[in-house]
Amino acid sequence: DEPFGPIGTLQSFETLDEVITQANRLPFALAAYVFTRSLKLTHATVNRLEAGVIGVNTFVASTAETPFGGSKDSGFGREGGSTAIRDYLDTKFINLAMPQDAL
């Protein structure tokens, strides 16, 4: 089961690769949080994390105006924000060729 609550662990790592491997090893990926003073490290980390929502230097990773949802076994699609409507749509392409007199 996926823990859903205020659970946090502190671990030390030697390399960023170790951090990413440890974070991405789980089948659940609702949210991830990164705390750093380095913008370079921020970009290197968030681009490799497999999570639906990522907070950087904050625990507030989503607002009502932004899409929210998990990755992997933590969910499918997004809720919130104007882009979320796409997850509720079933897009269909219809190519119709009718003779002129059929109109």
Give, region by region, the residue ranges found by the protein language model.
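Conserved C-terminal structural/oligomerization subdomain of aldehyde/semialdehyde dehydrogenase
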Residues: 1-103
